[in-house]
Amino acid sequence: AEPDDAIQKALSGFIARAGHHEISALARVALAEILRQKNPAEARAVALEAVERHPQSVGAKQCHNLVAQIEAKELAVATERTWAKPWPALHVTYRNIDRFHLRLVKADWEERLLEGKPYGYGIDQKDRERILSHPSIQEGTVVLPPTDDYRSAVKEVPVESVFGTETIDPGAYWVVCSHRGDFRERDNVVSATLVWVSRISAVNTTDYQSHISQHTGYVVDLESGKPIQGAEVTAWRRDQKSLPRKMVKQETTETNQDGQYTLKADSGQETVFVVSSALDGQIHHVLTEPERLWHRENV
């Protein structure tokens, strides 16, 4: 932006004239903050000079913090919620690391539901400790192109290049990622993503404008694309009376010949559905995203 260019020019001129004085360290903080978005490496160099020239100054301490932020390690991994053939990819956003490590860990989805956690996000410290205490089913390491410019980079990593997909049984798993091989949390970035290895896809078709309070959807075999008849669909609803508010297992139905299911809806109550079916001799499960349907009175 032009205002930033003018400020940058003014700050650079001030630093050139007053570089010997510790007040220039404050100018370097301001200049580094402007440069940070466009050129993190240059911003780091500007801030480091303040630290070296005037280490005891207020500006140098602020520059030290800025350098630490620019040098901070970043790792975020996103992937499809359901894994099936063709296997998806891991979408990796990273900075200041040259590799990361993965573990595939069995997830107790029913335990999470009973604790009132029907989703894979919102991992707290207790969850993280529990996940890291479980043995891994498989492990892998991904080498990344370096980010010498201190910018975030994105890389797509095929799941099949990391894990032996042919030996992964259907079920729920945590994909645990760490830039440290020992997965310890000190000086580390550890994340966990819940995935379902399953051929089942549950498609929500609930009409939220309808006056009929019911949840509807279809269950499809991802491999063949055909509807699954006889799949078991169980509703779990949020218990408003318990603290913390747990999910409670309630009624079950089966899909018809078109793969369709219908279950009653309790107005305003958060509901998820566990869908199960035997396919080629193996039981497959999948958990839907939470739904909430409000009853509409006839007008």
For the regions a language model picked out, list residue spans one by one.
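N-terminal, cleavable Sec-dependent signal peptides of secreted/periplasmic/extracellular proteins
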Residues: 1-299
